[in-house]
Amino acid sequence: IQHVRSIFVLTHDSIGLGEDGPTHQPVEHLLSLRAIPNLAVYRPCDVVETAEAWACALEDAGRPSVLALSRQNLPQLRVEAAPENLVARGAYRLRRAAAPRRVVFLATGSEVAIACDAAAALEAEGIGCDVVSMPCWERFDAQPADYRAGLLPGDALIVSVEAGVTLGWERYTGSAGLRFG
């Protein structure tokens, strides 16, 4: 069954809606889903990423997929047309540093907007900061090493931001990076 295309759409993916109470704050679910062999877990940040994730799930006939969606209203971050499906690579640079890059925020879902705001605040202080949206670990891990290194360079502080447990993010942030969940 792990080699059959089936698509699961899940909602309420984080703690963003506190008024629903503690039973609606699934901090461990994303990690648990990512631990399932051959399952592609997508956590898009906006409407464009959601459409691209859906297209990836439809084309991927050899495994099941999960789209973990937020219930809260989120800003539209992708406003320029891209010539390709950026989610298909698992991660991509959403925002390039204006000053010399010293920090890379790596985020998923609703936290991508938070990472963009934090990057803007750092840039205002003269600290260059990229924002990498990483809607799908599994697809990113399948990319060539040079692509992965281009997004997560060794000379920058890598900071992951996801509303969930941080276990697993160290593979991307390294031991010197920071993980916020």
Where on the chain are the PLM-derived regions?
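Thiamine diphosphate
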Residues: 7, 16-26, 59-181
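Conserved thiamine diphosphate
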Residues: 2-5, 11-60, 96
